[in-house]
């Protein structure tokens, strides 16, 4: 008996999947009592087919999706093309043809996931996407299964390997933003246009998917607050270390009584926090829940083999569900109405770096500005000025989002003060 699959896209992960199937052939056969066979591979043009054959791949390469749709033996289609189009159009056609889908396309799922999941349910087929979040970490299935009896209250993750690589270089080797980005591009971690990585967009897509599994609520990327790495200076990293923190780009979801709040932002993590030691291109997700307490899931966030492993796990799960007659069930069965938290209910400590005139009385003026919004200080550091301008660094006590925005507005109105940076600070 065989399970016939088709692959759309034959890039890094697409070429890694056949190798993984071959390496695990005996184990897969024992688990499924069937052999997984790659029946067709969709390629973009004849030149790509020639290149693949020259590399030793001898699959049935095709140039149109229709050739896959017309093959009644193919039950699972694996989309590994990336980007929203033509992936969305292709997946829609595959689902309507009654075939199951596995994808690693986080962009597509974050933007059009609700629509595609509804379509899959209507046509009684599977739509699985474990590899879309944190590559080789089986976090989605863990949330869907192992946390089904628990209430998650807080999720915090390092979800983008490129930005984490850059922050590691900035923290451990005192590199600048530009130096760390150039190295990430040289190593192939960052694209020539790094916007999605450095501005928190990629992480926000993953956070949108995680919100469904962890909290049962669907968030669009537009409902997730985003800030990235571009404004981070060496002095910010140095001050974080001086105060006992590590600066990381994190994705966070908090649930409070009024709803959930999701944010991607540079964050001061206490050096004792489990995520503070997650370095390089690695990813991790830290979860606080009522039953289990604190738990963390760590692993490769990308790469050929880790991502292909998650893709293959989805294929195995689909075959099992076909055998037990539950193939139409959603990947994530936890859903409730989305409720966004009241900004007054979202509280954190914050780091502020403010440039002021280097003259008597300016620190007092700055203190008065903050206290006018009922914001008090946990730590204050006035850096040595040049006789003209100085920098004051503040870590506040807990404040809510409304107070944070008010402080930003007041600093913008003050011609003598310039807000250089502000970052969330975690820890008691």
Swiss-Prot record:
One of its GO terms (biological process) is threonine biosynthetic process. Pathway: Amino-acid biosynthesis; L-methionine biosynthesis via de novo pathway; L-homoserine from L-aspartate: step 3/3; Amino-acid biosynthesis; L-threonine biosynthesis; L-threonine from L-aspartate: step 3/5. Its EC number is 1.1.1.3. It catalyses: L-homoserine + NADP(+) = L-aspartate 4-semialdehyde + NADPH + H(+); L-homoserine + NAD(+) = L-aspartate 4-semialdehyde + NADH + H(+). GO terms for molecular function: homoserine dehydrogenase activity; metal ion binding; NAD+ binding; NADP binding. The active site is at 206 (proton donor). A sodium ion is seen in the structure; a metal ion may subtly affect the relative position of the nucleotide-binding region to influence enzyme activity, and could increase the stability of the enzyme. Catalyzes the conversion of L-aspartate-beta-semialdehyde (L-Asa) to L-homoserine (L-Hse), the third step in the biosynthesis of threonine and methionine from aspartate. It is an enzyme of class 1 (oxidoreductase). This is Homoserine dehydrogenase. Na(+) binds at residues 130, 133, 135, 137. NADP(+) binds at residues 13, 44, 106, 188, 191, 303. Residues 351-425 form the ACT domain.
């Amino acid at each position: 008996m065989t399970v016939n699959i088709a692959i759309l896209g034959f890039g890094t992960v697409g070429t890694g999947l056949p190798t993984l199937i071959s390496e695990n052939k005996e184990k897969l056969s024992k688990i499924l009592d069937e052999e997984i066979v790659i029946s067709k591979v969709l390629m973009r043009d004849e030149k790509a087919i020639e290149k693949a054959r020259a590399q030793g791949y001898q699959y049935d390469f095709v140039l149109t999706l229709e050739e896959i749709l017309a093959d009644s033996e193919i039950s699972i289609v694996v989309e590994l093309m990336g980007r929203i189009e033509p992936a969305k159009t292709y997946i829609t056609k595959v689902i309507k043809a009654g075939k199951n889908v596995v994808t690693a396309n986080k962009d597509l799922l974050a933007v059009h996931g609700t629509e595609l999941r509804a379509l899959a349910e209507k046509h009684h087929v599977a739509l699985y996407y474990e590899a879309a979040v944190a590559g080789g970490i089986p976090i989605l299935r863990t949330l869907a299964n192992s946390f089904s009896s628990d209430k998650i209250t807080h999720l915090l993750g390092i979800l983008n390997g490129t930005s984490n690589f850059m922050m590691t270089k900035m923290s451990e080797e005192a590199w600048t933003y530009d130096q760390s980005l150039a190295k990430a591009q040289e190593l192939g971690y960052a694209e020539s246009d790094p916007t999605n990585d450095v501005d928190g967009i990629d992480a926000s897509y993953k956070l949108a998917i995680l919100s469904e599994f962890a909290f049962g609520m669907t968030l669009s990327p537009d409902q997730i607050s985003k800030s990235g790495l571009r404004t981070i200076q060496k002095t910010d990293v140095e001050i974080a270390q001086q105060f006992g923190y590590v600066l990381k780009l994190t994705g966070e979801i908090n649930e409070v009584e009024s709803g959930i709040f999701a944010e991607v932002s540079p964050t001061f993590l206490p050096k004792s926090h489990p995520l503070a030691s997650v370095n390089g291109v690695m990813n991790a997700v830290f979860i606080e829940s009522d039953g289990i307490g604190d738990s963390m899931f760590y692993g490769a966030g990308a790469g050929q083999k880790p991502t292909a492993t998650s893709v293959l796990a989805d294929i195995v799960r689909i075959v099992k569900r076909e055998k037990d007659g539950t193939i139409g069930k959603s990947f994530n069965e936890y859903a409730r109405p989305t409720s966004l938290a009241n900004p007054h209910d979202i509280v954190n400590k914050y780091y502020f770096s403010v440039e002021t005139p280097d003259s008597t009385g300016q620190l007092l003026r700055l203190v008065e500005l903050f206290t006018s919004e009922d914001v008090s200080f946990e730590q204050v550091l006035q850096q040595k000025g040049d006789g003209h301008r100085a920098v004051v660094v503040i870590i506040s006590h807990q404040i809510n989002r409304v107070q944070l925005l008010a402080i930003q507005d007041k600093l913008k109105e003050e011609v003598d003060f310039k807000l250089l940076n502000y970052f969330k600070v975690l820890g008691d």
